[in-house]
């Protein structure tokens, strides 16, 4: 069951005078940034909007038990309607996920591109090629997977109707 993002944004806007930005991204919003934990929410909608569209940022998990899997890993999306500089955000995520390096492995294979900088103490959390291949295969069959999950939910709902259990919408 998703959060009431309308209410969350009402509270964030009402209290934004208490907010003090610590970096350029925060200053752009001039309020608390709302992040949706969308780990299990790939393909879901809220009021006809993708779950990725209701918050400033949305994080997804691609763990083996999630709706779309790469065995491990995940992704972060952001809502472009806020006038964000997509390239700057992408570059920041790339650097943080590649040990702080300014070039990924593919970029370093090009002639004369072996040189790179380490700008920050980053992390190793970029997706391996084999995991990406699994994810692409899952994505091709995702609509069928999602439809099958909906069928199972409908069967469970129907089976529980005779019990003293209230099924949430």
Residue ranges and their predicted role:
Residues 1, 53-54:
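Glycine/serine-rich loop-strand microenvironments at binding/catalytic pocket rims
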Residues 22-27, 40-47, 54-169:
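Active-site region of PLP-dependent enzymes
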Residues 1-48, 80:
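Catalytic PLP-binding core of fold-type I/II PLP enzymes
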């Amino acid at each position: 069951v998703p959060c009431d993002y309308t209410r969350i944004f009402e509270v964030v806007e009402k209290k934004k005078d208490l907010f003090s930005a610590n970096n350029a991204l925060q200053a752009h919003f001039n309020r608390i940034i709302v992040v949706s934990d969308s780990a299990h929410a790939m393909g879901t909608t809220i009021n006809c909007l993708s779950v990725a569209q209701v918050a400033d940022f949305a994080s997804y998990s691609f763990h083996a038990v999630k709706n779309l899997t790469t065995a491990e890993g995940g992704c972060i999306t952001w809502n472009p309607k806020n006038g964000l500089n997509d390239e700057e955000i992408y570059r920041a995520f790339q650097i943080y996920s590649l040990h702080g390096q300014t070039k990924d492995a593919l970029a370093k294979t090009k002639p004369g591109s072996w040189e790179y900088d380490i700008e920050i103490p980053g992390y190793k959390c970029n997706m391996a090629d084999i995991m990406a291949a699994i994810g692409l295969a899952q994505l091709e069959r995702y609509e069928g997977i999602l439809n099958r999950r909906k069928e199972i939910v409908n069967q469970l709902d129907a089976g529980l109707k005779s019990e003293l259990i209230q099924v949430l919408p």
